[in-house]
Amino acid sequence: PAHLLMPLVISLALMATGSVMDSFSSNLTRPQNLYVSQFLLGFGGTFFLGPTMVLGTKNVLTNPRNLVSFSVMFGICQNLGGLIGAALLGTFQIVREKFHSSMIVEHLTLLDPRVAARVQSGGSAYGGIVADPELRNLMGIRSLATAATREANVMAYNDVFMLIAIIAIL
């Protein structure tokens, strides 16, 4: 069991590295930019499972009648851990998206010439389709709101990956 410590440390380091790599994403990040980092996360998680299971079977080897209990508990922990982990990370992502969204929107005012220009350019994209200038302005505002939400989501996912890295390091 002492020799199993190193694979656990390596797997946690791989997961932390992959998470840190993904925590600097932007709206320009594409799937091909995530291949290496997601491989590190997936491989690290899989590599973590083997030594953990071997460490858990240590007590089963000394008392074989605990095999069924171990198998059931291991399965329950895997399923509940996956569900609870996904739920907690999803909740964290939503909370962080709301935070980032409020921070972004707080700085958007139509009195700012850059914001007004962005709204106008967003509305001008519909110039050939929508004749009403008020409706085009509304479409420009909606376009800006969509961009702000997208940026807030990217920042929130960056926060999620940084949280995963921190958990892996601890």
Per-range role (PLM):
Residues 73-170:
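Hydrophobic transmembrane architecture of multi-pass small-molecule transporters
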